[in-house]
Amino acid sequence: SSTEFTGGDGGFPYIDQISTKYLISNYVYNDAVYLYSLVGTTYSNGYSSMYLSSSSDGDSSDDTEGDFINPGALDSNLDILYANGSKSGNFKIRRFIDLDTNSPSDNYITGLPNSPSAFHISTHTSTSTTLLVGTDHGEVLLIRDANSSNSASQIGNFIGSVSNLKFGSNEQEIYVTLYNYGVVNIKYTSDGGTNWDDKDGNLPDIPVLAIQPNPYSSDEVIIGTDLGVWKTTN
C-alpha cells in the first residue's frame, strides 16, 4: 500500500537517510517545501507536518524563488536541506536548518556567480557539509562547512549547464556532467579541480543528465543521457 503526501506538478523529494525521522516534498520553485514527520513529531504549528517555505504563509517571493523544478540536496547527518534560492539575478542557496527539531528555520548562502542547477553532498564527511554546486552557466563550486559557511570556491568553469556532479572515492575525485549539445558533456578531476579531463569518449553528442561512479570498481561509471543509460569500464 502507499500514501499520497502531496500532489501537483511534482519536484524533488528528500528522505532522512540516517534516522528516517522525516521526509520533504516540493511542489514548484520554493513555493511549497513541505516537511512531514515520520515519527509523530509535533511541530511549532501544532501538526506533524509544516511548510518550510510557501507563498501561502504570506511570503509571495517563495512562488518564484529558484527553478520551476527546483534542485537541492539533503544532508541527513546534519538535518539541513540546501536548495536553489535564486531570484531576480540574486544568485544564492537557501539553507533549511534544524529539520529534526520542532522549529526548523532557514537562511541563505549568497554571492554565487550564477543560479545553481545541481547539488551533491559529500559522503566523506559527517560532522560538517562539504557541498558541490553546479550552475546553469557551467561553474562548479565547492563549499566546505556549508552548514555554517557563506563562502564558495570556484573549482571548474565549463561551456554548458551543469546537470549532475558527484564525488568519487575521495573529495579530490569529482565527476561533472553537462546537458547541452555541442559541448564536452563529462568532465573529471582527480586533484580537486586543479586539472580537468574530458571523458566523453565515444559517447554521441547528446545531453548527459546524470552520472554514478561504482564505489566497488573505480573503472566503472554509469551515465544517464537523453539516449538511455550508458556505462564505461575503463
Where are each of the predicted segments found?
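Extracellular glycan-interacting surfaces
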Residues: S1-N234
